[in-house]
Regions:
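Canonical position 11/12 of the leucine-rich repeat
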Residues: 84-88, 111-114, 138-142, 165-169, ...
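Extracellular beta-strand/beta-solenoid scaffold signature
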Residues: 117-119, 144, 171-172, 198-201, ...
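Short acidic, glycine-rich loop/turn motifs
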Residues: 36-39, 56, 107, 242, ...
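Leucine-biased recognition of intrinsically disordered, low-complexity hydrophobic segments
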Residues: 166, 195, 205, 213, ...
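Short, solvent-exposed linear patches
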Residues: 68-77, 94-105, 121-132, 148-159, ...
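Long tandem-repeat architectures and their stereotyped inter-repeat linkers in very large proteins
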Residues: 142, 247-250, 304, 320-321, ...
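N-terminal capping/linker segments that flank leucine-rich repeat
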Residues: 1-98, 120-123, 149, 174-176, ...
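Feature marks extracellular polysaccharide-active and adherence modules
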Residues: 68, 82, 108-109, 135-136, ...
Length: 430
């Protein structure tokens, strides 16, 4: 039986700088596929022997590629990966993808690609990996209609739409079956012009373990879908989840999320600088996270924080910059009873909280494992006094530079004359 022929028409920005396929795709499929360049055949085994320069020289005017035997292929990962001068790909809308398992990095870093077919009517029922599929397609202004893709077997969607900087709307992926997806890290990261997301409120995240950076740098989105009912009980990483969602006016009510297995909550709300309030996350179980650094960093419009005074901090080792640059806060929750006995880094904790009128009584914090307190109270310009921190054990601290820098309203300092400074090697700007 004659091999099936799939013809792809491609256009390049610079004819002299042709890179046809990603090396991983070639390596995976060299025995299954023959490429025909305008009637000149070259099997994939020969392709990987030839240098890019040789191919450019031999086929500098190529506009059409025919792939013979595409229906046999199970892996198209990196197929067009790093084809940085590729402008257009056509005739792929009805590809026979019945056997394909892996679509990882299919169009990854096709930075000049401006056009894909309106709809990709592909059978994706066997695909398990869609990660990095459109990663850094920075010239694409729209994506194909992929709303009907079968995603039941997909386990990895990480970085799928990452850095699609010009996309203003996504296909309606609200009905995608995500019950087996494990990794959604950076799924929509860097979609800077995206104005809204499809209604992904009913996505099933029961098996997801990583949703970190998922909405990171979605600068233009004002409201997110109601993701309050997502089951994230297996998730271990939510770091930078809403990082730099700098146009968000409110967040869904995520107060009842089960975050008990999360290990990393760093920078979750960082640079959400238009939010004036957060959901009531006071009952979040943070007994497992080791990292809460910069969690609320530069939430500069926040008028108050949820009452996080009862959070179990016993396993946390990083809270540096946690409240830094929350410039509108005039007070903080009573965090005086936090158990920070395992914390090693609290640098810049209250840095640039320029409207704070007072601090909780943190005089009894166990500082025995802390090695950095630099910049902790820096630029707290409205404080007239500090808690009595004279009895803090800072015997393991090496860096206290800029500790009280620019605390311009302070009338006096606690008596820190008896601090054990034997390990300190940085005190400039204290």
């Amino acid at each position: 039986m004659k091999d099936e022929v799939d013809e792809i028409t491609i256009f390049y920005k610079y004819r002299a700088k042709i890179k046809l396929f990603g090396s991983k795709f070639v390596e995976n499929n060299k025995h299954l596929c023959t490429i025909e360049f305008d009637g000149k055949q070259l099997n994939l085994q020969e392709y990987i022997i030839l240098s890019n320069e040789q191919i450019s020289r031999l086929y500098h005017s190529i506009i059409t590629i025919k792939l013979k035997g595409i229906s046999k292929i199970t892996n198209i990962e990196h197929m067009f990966s790093n084809c940085r001068n590729l402008l257009n790909v056509t005739n792929i809308d009805n590809w026979n993808t019945n056997k394909i398992i892996n679509m990882n990095s299919l169009f990854r870093e096709c930075e000049s690609l401006k056009c894909l077919p309106h709809k990709l009517d592909w059978n994706t029922s066997k695909v398990t990996d869609m990660s990095y599929m459109f990663f850094r397609c920075i010239s694409l202004s729209s994506l194909p209609n992929i709303s009907n893709w079968e995603t039941k077997n997909v386990t990895n969607m990480s970085y799928m739409f990452d850095d699609c900087k010009l996309i203003q709307s996504l296909p309606d992926i609200s009905n995608w079956n995500t019950e087996n997806v494990i990794n959604m890290k950076s799924l929509f990261f860097g979609c800077e012009k995206l104005l809204s997301l499809p209604d992904i409120s009913n996505w099933d995240l029961r098996n997801a373990t990583n949703i970190g950076l998922m909405f990171d740098n979605c600068w233009s989105i004002k409201y997110l879908p109601d993701i309050s009912k997502w089951n994230i009980e297996k998730v271990t990483n939510i770091n930078c989840l809403f990082f730099d969602c700098s146009s968000l006016l409110s967040l869904p009510n995520i107060s009842k999320w089960n975050v008990s297995n999360c290990k990393d909550m760093s920078e979750v709300f960082k640079y959400c600088n238009t939010l004036s309030y957060l959901p009531d996350i006071s009952k979040w179980n943070v007994s497992n996270p080791s990292n809460l650094e910069e969690m609320f960093y530069s939430c500069s419009s926040l008028l108050s924080l949820p009452d996080i005074s009862k959070w179990d901090m016993s396993k946390v080792n990083k809270i540096n910059g946690m409240f830094s640059s929350c410039k509108s806060l005039t007070s903080l929750p009573d965090i005086s009873k936090w158990n920070i006995s395992n914390v090693s880094n609290i640098e810049n904790l209250f840095d640039s909280c320029s409207s704070l009128l007072s601090l909780p009584d943190i005089s009894k914090w166990d500082m025995s494992k802390v090695n950095k307190i630099n910049g902790m109270f820096s630029s707290c310009k409205s404080l007239t006094s500090l808690p009595d921190i004279s009895k803090w054990n800072i015997s393991n601290v090496s860096n206290i530079e800029n500790l009280f820098d620019s605390c311009s309203s302070l009338l006096s300092l606690p008596d820190i004359s008896k601090w054990d400074m034997s390990k300190v090697n940085k005190i400039n700007g204290m």
